[in-house]
Design a protein with these regions (language model features):
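Short linear motifs at protein or domain termini
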Residues: 1-103, 207
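Short helix-capping and inter-helix turn/linker motifs at the boundaries of alpha-helical repeat units
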Residues: 12, 110-111, 174-178
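Signal-transduction coiled-coil helices of two-component systems
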Residues: 59, 120-123, 213
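Short, flexible turn/loop "capping" segments at secondary-structure junctions
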Residues: 66-68, 136, 178-180
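Conserved amphipathic alpha-helical segments that form helical-bundle/coiled-coil interaction surfaces
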Residues: 86, 104-168, 181-189, 197-203
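Single conserved hydrophobic/aromatic residue that forms the stacking wall/gate
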Residues: 204-208, 212-216
Length: 216
């Protein structure tokens, strides 16, 4: 069963479909290899087939779905090589962001990050994976913005769904508490302005969940 969020004010039908489908693909409510039922999804989303098909074409270009003429449309399987490319890009950028954070972040910036981390405990206790995932995304987005690199974040975010699926799957084989501890260690290194430790911890944090998800 897919989850459908409310349509935003002034959001086009295509953008709405795109956002909802990406969210459900990332969170594996639409599973890898699953066939999309166009008439049913159009009815659930309250849109006509034209914007739905426009969204499908964009998802196909982003390699999140596969359109098979006269057969159907399927959620793409996880492509290990593509995930590794995205992981490598993120690792390079985010290790540099972690190093920059040691230099640039103010006490107020660091407090914002600690506020994010503080919420993890509640959602870990409730085993709410999607909330934890949102906090994880929010933590990294904050770091990019605080370091003055929002364009870097946009670059990564465009490719993120491929990597994000492995992050969600990693929660099934790696306790969320471990990822929480990664964030605590990274934030402590940033707070202490330890560039070497922050760089190293960021690389480990990005690499381990992907490896576990792909071998599970």
């Amino acid at each position: 069963m897919i989850t459908i969020s409310e349509r935003r004010e002034h959001e086009s039908a295509k953008s709405f479909v795109l956002r909802v489908l990406i969210d459900n693909i990332i969170n594996t409510r639409l599973e890898p290899g699953e066939k999309l039922n166009e008439p049913e999804l159009c009815e659930q989303l309250g849109v006509s087939r034209t914007p739905f098909r426009e969204a499908e074409l964009e998802l196909a270009q982003r390699r999140l779905i596969e359109i098979r003429p006269k057969i159907g449309t399927y959620v793409s399987l996880i492509d290990a090589e593509l995930v590794e490319e995205v992981r490598h890009l993120r690792a390079v950028l985010e290790a540099e962001i972690a190093r920059m954070a040691c230099e640039k972040l103010t006490p107020a910036d660091i407090d914002q990050l600690w506020e994010n981390v503080a919420l993890w405990r509640m959602y870990i206790e409730r085993a709410q994976e999607e909330k934890i995932f949102e906090l994880d995304k929010g933590f990294h987005r904050l770091l990019y913005v605080q370091c003055g690199c929002p364009y870097w974040y946009d670059l990564v975010e465009n490719l993120a769904p491929h990597f994000d699926r492995t992050t969600i799957l990693s929660f099934r084989c790696r306790p969320a508490k471990t990822i929480y501890e990664d964030h605590v260690s990274l934030l402590k290194a940033i707070e202490q302005k330890d560039e070497v430790a922050a760089h190293r911890l960021s690389l480990i944090h990005i690499s381990e969940p992907t490896r576990l998800a792909l071998i599970s």
